[in-house]
């Protein structure tokens, strides 16, 4: 799925667009025990509650593609004959009316997801009459292209509110508000099947994870029967480690600055092009980039080999997972420097009197702890004002 396809399905989760007739739910306590289950018809809910329910579900299709939204492919063998794929198909094809399939799915999630507190599992089914899209991009609402039938799973923490004072308007007084339990933003979930090329793709699901640093290995293994992808934050850390270890003494400030600048440039160009397909690079692409930066060929080769070992051969990585586009950071054991990436080229390293230094040009407006300071030349005497 690309960004346009995700946005198209996300827009379905509105009261005037959705064909969702009911939502299945399972409330689980901190002991992994089912507290309650429900099958809630949306038509019986007040409009505000219906919109809140759809809003919670919609968030499962939010975030950045490749970071929060990750494609989970199924092998041909899984699609032909596997318990995990058969269960997902049963949920979809029955429109969540297969009680045994719903029960088995809830049990799978509970056995594989163990947060500290209570949580809510939501299942929704929607049937989308996909409108025809002409070659010029215009959508013809009255001309259907195909029917897309899918299920969306959302897992949300349920948290207790804190005691607070509330204002009672009729009595014109303040009282303690009762402690309550509220449904928080989704922690993880998935869409099945994927909406690839604007049609159902039973060979793929779109997995959602709110945190870019979390990896719910057991959940992914239970639901998709596959290895969990490396979280975005771990990709960034691993990429930096590979860069430093493989280049060794060739990993200079200039090289890191250039790599950061070029990756950020690729991200900006992709954003400006409005290409819906995700931007990716491979270890081979990075090897070419490093060679262009002046890195010796054998070290660039070592980098490519390390990428294949850590990420997989010919793995397609999102540059957004590898660099911070809004900051450029330098750390020593004692000092931390953060610079707007636009001005990172101002920083340089130099040996002075045999000691290594990090140099930053100081213009006007220098402050220390909020106090503006003056930087004087050592060969110029300070003159007192009369």
What are these language model-derived features?
Residues 291-386:
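C-terminal, beta-strand-rich globular interaction domains
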